[in-house]
């Protein structure tokens, strides 16, 4: 079990069996902050008393119940990270957590208040932890293992049969998750204009869905690399079971160490694990690996340009507990990097943000439906609740377009760099 899931807050040593001075102090602050809510509508239950806040006419509403007053100390001392920790500990509940997070996103002033004051004292601690998780060659390996090597069995319980852990594309409202995953793979393959006999380099194997699908359905060859031990083992077996050893070459190599020359490269939601400081290195490596006129298809999760500079230096609960070392990209960051560090041209951009909200909703339903099986793998209730919050948090972010997901197509043109 990863030590990233040891829910720890500067208030964690306080007793949760009785009310404390801090609980009451932070409760007053919480109520005061929430009274600034302008968009959305909430009913908040505390100690049997109900507070009605926000816009009663809003179609976006939820009922929030504080189960134990230790919640107030956690959010007061840890901000929104503390709220996530409190949910993992079972200190609050809500009938619609997606609506709750959407309301908070729409009321940025309220979110900012929770992360200021005493809660800001936790920021240097979190940043210190985050700095120790830099995506060096050894650090990237450790960070990837912390997320993807929880166990293949864990992910098999709630991903679709393709074992694709990235946004699908739903052709219609009746499309299944598996169909959406395959549609996404086909979309990227079509962008690359793959023909039988072509060789594609894939940066980030996952569990092998792209490599095997491309080889089997399009008759091409794929060289694919991962630094996850569990994913490598799973993909190796998948390649063997599907008799694709002659078409798919599986590597366990960091992208920075890749060599060779390729006409076509693909990378699906791996760039989030690179770290913002390594984005120029990543794109330069891709540019160097591509032949002149070669194509690069990328699927990546983005953060709003306007808030990106603040975001990339912050540490949210996903960095702290779910995916150490992770950082989303921004569209302007990508374009700036292309201009300064590569011979790549952006040819096409497909916004699939709305599809990610549905993808996450399906994953969450599957995940919660397998709660008992997940527990039997050795994951405790804190872990399950924290991951539930992670899936909900992301779903709300995509609905509100606080974060996005795009498929990019780039072409290499020699001589662009001075």
Where would I find each of the regions flagged by the language model?
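Conserved SAM-binding loop
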Residues: 235-236
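Conserved beta-strand signature within the Rossmann-like core of class I S-adenosyl-L-methionine
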Residues: 293-301
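Conserved class I S-adenosyl-L-methionine
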Residues: 197-206
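A short glycine-rich, Lys/Arg-flanked "PGG" loop and its adjoining helix->strand segment in the class I
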Residues: 280-292
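Substrate-binding/catalytic lobe of Class I Rossmann-like enzymes that use SAM or dcSAM, i.e.
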Residues: 302-418
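Feature captures hydrophobic
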Residues: 1-181, 187
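Conserved SAM-binding loop of SAM-dependent methyltransferases across substrates and taxa
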Residues: 207-218
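A short acidic, Gly/Pro-enriched loop at the edge of an enzyme's catalytic core
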Residues: 256-265
């Amino acid at each position: 079990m990863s030590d990233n899931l040891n829910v720890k807050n500067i208030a964690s040593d306080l007793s949760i069996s009785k009310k404390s001075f801090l609980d009451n102090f932070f409760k007053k602050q919480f109520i005061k902050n929430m009274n600034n809510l302008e968009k959305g509508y909430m009913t908040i239950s505390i100690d049997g008393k109900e507070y009605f806040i926000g816009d009663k006419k809003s179609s976006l509403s939820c009922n929030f119940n504080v189960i134990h007053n230790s919640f107030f100390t956690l959010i007061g001392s840890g901000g929104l990270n503390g709220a996530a920790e409190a949910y993992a500990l079972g200190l609050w509940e809500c009938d619609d957590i997606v609506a709750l997070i959407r309301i908070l996103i729409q009321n940025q002033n309220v979110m900012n208040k929770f992360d200021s004051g005493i809660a800001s004292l936790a920021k240097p601690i979190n940043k210190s932890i985050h700095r120790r998780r830099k995506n060096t060659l050894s650090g990237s390996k450790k960070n990837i293992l912390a997320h993807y090597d929880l166990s293949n069995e864990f992910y098999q319980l709630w991903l679709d049969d393709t074992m694709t852990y990235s946004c699908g594309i739903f052709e219609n409202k009746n499309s299944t998750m598996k169909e959406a995953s395959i549609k996404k793979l086909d979309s990227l393959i079509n962008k690359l204009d793959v023909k039988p006999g072509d060789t594609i380099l894939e940066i980030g194997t996952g569990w092998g869905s792209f490599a095997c699908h491309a080889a089997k359905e399009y008759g091409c060859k794929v060289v694919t690399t991962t630094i996850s031990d569990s994913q490598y083992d799973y993909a190796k077996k998948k390649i063997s079971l599907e008799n694709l050893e002659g078409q798919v070459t599986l590597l366990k190599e960091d992208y920075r160490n890749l060599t060779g020359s390729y006409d076509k490269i693909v990378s699906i939601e791996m760039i989030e694990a690179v770290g913002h400081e390594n984005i120029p290195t990543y794109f330069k490596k891709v540019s160097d690996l591509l032949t002149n006129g070669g194509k690069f298809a990328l699927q990546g999760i983005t953060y709003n340009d306007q808030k990106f500079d603040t975001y990339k230096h912050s540490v949210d609960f996903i960095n702290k507990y779910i995916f150490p070392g992770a950082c989303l990209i921004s569209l302007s960051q990508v374009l700036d990097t292309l201009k300064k560090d590569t011979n790549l041209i952006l040819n096409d951009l497909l916004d699939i943000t709305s599809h990610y909200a549905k993808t996450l909703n399906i994953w969450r339903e599957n995940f919660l439906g397998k709660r008992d099986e997940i527990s039997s793998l050795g994951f405790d209730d804190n872990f399950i609740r924290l991951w539930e919050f992670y899936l909900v948090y992301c779903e709300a972010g995509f609905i509100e377009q606080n974060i996005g997901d795009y498929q990019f197509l780039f072409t290499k043109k020699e001589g662009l760099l001075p």
